[in-house]
Amino acid sequence: MSGSAVSKRYASALFDIANESAQLNQVEEELIVVKQVFQNEKALNDVLNHPKVPAAKKKELIQNAFGSLSQSVLNTIFLLIDRHRAAIVPELTDEFIKLANVARQTEDAIVYSVKPLTDAEMLPLSQVFAKKAGVASLRIRNEVQTDLIGGIKVRIGNRIYDGSVSGKLQRIERQLAGENR
């Protein structure tokens, strides 16, 4: 079974547990932290993926590092360690977030702008683009990109809505280049 299929199964099982115990938000937040640590700490990955380190030592390391995690997240990580699949934690996290977003009718969006946007500026963007995306709400993360010149660019999943000045200039350039052929 491929890694993504495996991570989907574990994510689905963890999602069911979190949903039944009304801990969806908490489990999602914990998984995001765990994913960041797994991605940023090469030494941790080396230990978790080393075949000569016993599973009990790996679990002890996780327990000491992430002792405050909910039992369902800890047990999932322990199960992954037992099955030599600790490396799929980042994928599992992404799949869990997708399932949680579907359940909440929410989607994640990135708004690129020339300057940081205030909450008052992001609220109408969230409302307008939630309708375009066909979801109840958007969780917006703002990233500053000075090369936009002005305006904004919104990325929701694999869709991009480009209302930036640089994007408009590029479209005009393509049109003019097409007419001059």
Swiss-Prot record:
Keyword Membrane (UniProt): yes
Keyword Membrane tagged: yes
Location relative to the cell: Cell membrane; Membrane raft
Gene Ontology annotations of biological process type: proton motive force-driven ATP synthesis
One Pfam short name: OSCP
Gene Ontology molecular functions: proton-transporting ATP synthase activity, rotational mechanism
Topology of this chain in the membrane: Peripheral membrane protein
Keywords: ATP synthesis, Cell membrane, CF(1), Hydrogen ion transport, Ion transport, Membrane, Transport
Lineage top rank: taxon: Bacteria
Record Gene3D superfamilies: N-terminal domain of the delta subunit of the F1F0-ATP synthase (1.10.520.20)
InterPro entries linked to this entry: ATP_synth_OSCP/delta_N_sf (IPR026015), ATPase_OSCP/d_CS (IPR020781), ATPase_OSCP/dsu (IPR000711)
Gene Ontology CC entries for this record: membrane raft; plasma membrane; proton-transporting ATP synthase complex
NCBIfam families: ATP_synt_delta, PRK05758.2-4
Its biological purpose: F(1)F(0) ATP synthase produces ATP from ADP in the presence of a proton or sodium gradient. F-type ATPases consist of two structural domains, F(1) containing the extramembraneous catalytic core and F(0) containing the membrane proton channel, linked together by a central stalk and a peripheral stalk. During catalysis, ATP synthesis in the catalytic domain of F(1) is coupled via a rotary mechanism of the central stalk subunits to proton translocation.
Membership in a protein family: Belongs to the ATPase delta chain family.
Subunit structure and binding partners: F-type ATPases have 2 components, F(1) - the catalytic core - and F(0) - the membrane proton channel. F(1) has five subunits: alpha(3), beta(3), gamma(1), delta(1), epsilon(1). F(0) has three main subunits: a(1), b(2) and c(10-14). The alpha and beta chains form an alternating ring which encloses part of the gamma chain. F(1) is attached to F(0) by a central stalk formed by the gamma and epsilon chains, while a peripheral stalk is formed by the delta and b chains. The F(1)F(0) complex interacts with SpoIIIJ and YqjG; YqgA is found in the same complex. Interacts with FloT.
Protein name: ATP synthase subunit delta
Organism of this sequence: Bacillus subtilis (strain 168)
